Design a protein with these regions (language model features):
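Extracellular/periplasmic metallocenter environments
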Residues: 115-116, 128, 139-193, 292-344, ...
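N-terminal, post-signal-peptide metal-ligating segments of extracellular/periplasmic oxidoreductases
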Residues: 18-147, 192-193, 220-252, 377-386, ...
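Histidine- and aromatic-rich segments of cupredoxin/plastocyanin-like copper-binding domains
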Residues: 132-139, 143-146, 199, 204, ...
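Fungal secretory targeting signals
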Residues: 1-28
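Active-site pocket scaffolds in enzymes
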Residues: 130-142, 277-290, 331-334, 377-522
Length: 522
């Protein structure tokens, strides 16, 4: 059972939703005049494709397969100088980065070398069009991979940008089972150097299994010991900081991912502005900011120009304290940018002013480069989030959606049960069954129940990009009074449900399967 994880699926017991519509086939690829070759100064082009290509319908057929072999292992590590039990992918935290080009086939062989636990690997934000069985959510699309067993994932890189993969087995990911994904493609802003994935994590000196057992009875999130940038940081006198070097005049692309368990971050690099050019897997019209709010599971592509006086500068990830667990290292989650690679001195730069709220980046800033409008829905689902403290005789405190908490049946995945008996979906609570092909559906997700604490939730949908139609904290949704943004609203797969407020999302039922919709706080 997964606490603090609100799962609406596209089909399983307890707070899920189901898309059982027919697929929308990729349109036949049209031959066109070749776009100028992709380069740092002309990143909008990608062979015969470009940023103007509708990537929901058209995908390059590269004929290339990128193959990876992952083994999960039990070990100990001191990523911040404090040794603890961890779980790793191929012996590292984060695990190896999956790298592919837009249109490639990706094959990942996962071997469970853990001593006592099952596992499954989910490829966060990857659309998995017509490959629902490869999504990697155990108890929904597959059984857990047993110790000593293997499972092979095979899917097409239908999007481009970056994301992360992580275990979807209980709270295993936050013991170290995660890594980056990079899918090369066009970009909406020029850059000179691709710095790859930059992960932002909170870090505990106890295992997440121990923390879960404690939190489930107390109802209070555990205190955080530290935070990591790309899997490393200092703590007291141990550990080391993440660091990299800038060359004056160059533009550097960072692919940010918030891989935290219970922390939204405010990210910045002292004295440097950021050009934000993608949110999740969606290229956007570039905008500038000096502080970036990034919720759990979200990704942003940013470009930093090395245009400051050559020196050393702090890279910082501050916890957004309005929704994040208290962190004893809140002001010390830092990396170092050096203009002189031989320098060993700590920076003396100062942080930008930032707010402690847990809001998303403004809707007005997240303008998709490829413009698409939302349409009138065939149906609207209401989803309420509540915190109930009297569920079981054991005293466990659980989060619920529409009164249901998530139940994991590892030996009876929802997808399998639905194929065996189609009436299963009608008899099981927590499922929204969406049966109309290629139709719009809206979800109104509210966070103002009588027992709901006033904190935000990062809401993640598998198998789809959704349209963010409305998002407001401290307010109640009204079908007549709430204004929806239907003209080119933000599209993404993870968005913040504001504290004591609501989030309205819309999407098209064009990807049949069993897909979870859940809060990404662990």
């Amino acid at each position: 059972m997964i606490p603090r994880k609100l799962l609406i699926a596209i089909g399983n017991v307890s707070s899920f939703f189901l898309v059982s519509a027919s697929p929308r086939s990729w349109s036949s690829l049209q031959q066109r005049d070749s776009c100028t070759f992709n380069s740092s100064t002309n990143p909008q082009c990608w062979g015969d494709y470009s940023l103007d290509t509708n990537y929901y319908d058209e995908v390059p057929n590269t004929g290339v397969t990128r193959e990876y072999w992952f083994e999960l292992q039990n070990t100990t590590a001191a990523v911040d100088g404090v040794e603890r039990i961890v779980l790793t992918v191929n012996g590292t935290i984060p695990g190896p980065t999956i790298v592919a080009d837009w249109g490639d086939n990706i094959v990942v062989h996962v071997t469970n070398g853990l001593q006592n636990n099952g596992t499954s690997i989910h490829f966060h934000g990857v659309r998995q069009l017509n490959t629902n069985q490869m999504d990697g959510t155990n108890s929904l699309q597959q059984c857990p991979i047993a110790p000593g067993d293997s499972f092979t994932h095979s899917f097409t890189a239908q999007q481009y940008g970056h994301s992360w993969y992580h275990s979807h087995f209980a709270v295993q990911a936050w013991n170290g089972v995660f890594g980056g994904i990079v899918i090369n493609g066009p970009a909406s802003a020029p850059y000179d150097v691709d710095m790859g994935v930059l992960t932002l994590s909170d870090w505990y000196h106890d295992t997440t299994d121990y923390l879960w057992a404690t939190e489930a009875r107390s109802g209070t999130p555990p205190s955080v010991n530290n935070g990591l940038i790309n899997g490393t940081n200092v703590y007291n006198s141990g550990g080391k900081r993440f660091g990299t070097t800038f060359q004056a005049g160059k533009k550097y692309r960072f692919r940010l991912v918030n891989t935290a368990m219970d922390t939204q971050f405010k990210f910045m690099i002292d004295n440097h502005n950021m050009t934000v050019m993608a949110s999740d897997f969606v290229p956007i019209v570039p905008y500038e900011t000096d502080v970036l709010s990034i919720a759990i599971g979200q990704r942003y592509d940013i470009v930093i120009e090395a245009n400051q006086v050559p020196s050393n500068y702090w890279m910082r990830a501050f916890p957004a304290t309005d929704c994040s667990g208290s962190n004893e290292s809140a002001d010390n989650i830092r990396g170092i940018i050096r203009y002189d690679p031989s320098s060993t001195e700590d920076p003396t730069s100062s942080a930008y002013t930032y707010t402690t709220d847990c809001n998303d980046e403004p809707i007005a800033s997240l303008v998709p480069y490829l413009s698409m409008n939302a349409s009138t829905p065939a149906s609207t689902q209401a989803v309420d989030i509540d915190f109930n403290t009297n569920i079981t005789d054991t005293g466990l405190r659980k989060w619920t959606i529409n009164g249901d908490d998530f139940q994991a049946y590892w030996d009876a995945p929802t997808l399998q049960q639905g194929l065996i008996n189609s009436s299963y979906f009608n008899a099981t609570s927590g499922i929204a069954r969406l049966t109309d092909d290629n139709s719009w559906v809206y979800f109104v997700i509210e966070n103002n129940g009588a027992n709901a604490p006033p904190i935000s939730h990062p809401i993640h949908l598998h198998g789809h990009d959704f349209y963010v139609l409305a998002q407001e904290g401290g307010a109640t949704y009204s079908s007549t009074g709430t204004t929806l943004q239907l003209t080119n609203p933000p599209r993404r797969d993870t968005a913040v449900l504001p504290a004591s407020g609501f989030l309205v999302i819309g999407f098209i039922t064009d990807n049949p399967g069993v897909w979870p919709l859940h809060c990404h706080v662990s």
